[in-house]
Amino acid sequence: EEKIRITPNGINVNGFLEIPGKTEEDQDAINVGAVLRVTPIKDVKTMIQAFAFAKKKVPKLKLWIMGPTDEDEKYAGECFDLVETLGIKDIIFTGRINVRDYIGRMDFTILTSISEGQPLTILESYAAGIPVIATDVGNCRELIFGNNDGLGDAGILTHIMNIEEIAQAMIKLAENPKERERMGQNG
């Protein structure tokens, strides 16, 4: 007889049924969303560097980093400086937001954490029908590939801190709208 049962995180998918979609300003962009705290464990610096490489190949890419920047102000400042040093356009730090106000504008989301449990941002992306790029940490592998559910993959899994691999994943999803749609439906 088991005395412990693990209950994974969950979200109310009904809250994602009627979310705003792309706006007029989004029509010429491929929006990449990152819903996270700007902290070292989320490895935002690797994300920024990978985005810089991907944007050279796909100029329409736009990265939305959505979440608080005040938890580790020094690290957030280093991220802002990195964007400036690399001279990257089209990276927006929104600060705290209501995820449902933005997620429908995204073509795919990304998570480059070096450690996770079961990230809510992946569940929120799937509830909105959006595929995910995530590092192979915590429960990300099972969330992306399923557990013998027969649905297929719902995103791309990468190694942690692998700038080239993460950039290639961004390029793949950016250049393949049908693949994005298929993966989004699988989520």
Q: What are these regions, as identified by a protein language model?
A:
Residues G10:
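Carbohydrate-associated surface elements
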Residues P131-A134, N139-I144:
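Short hydrophobic beta-strand element within catalytic cores of glycosyltransferases
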Residues E25-K42, I48-F51, W64:
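Conserved donor-binding/catalytic core segment of Leloir-type glycosyltransferases
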Residues I114:
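Aromatic "clamp/platform" in nucleotide-sugar-dependent glycosyltransferases that forms part
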Residues A76-R96:
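Nucleotide-activated donor-binding/catalytic signature segment of Leloir-type glycosyltransferases, i.e.
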Residues K172, E179-G187:
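A short, well-ordered alpha-helix in the C-terminal region of glycosyltransferases
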Residues G95-M106, A127:
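Short acidic alpha-helix that forms the nucleotide-activated donor recognition element
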Residues F145-I163, K172-P177:
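Conserved acidic donor-binding segment of nucleotide-sugar-dependent glycosyltransferases
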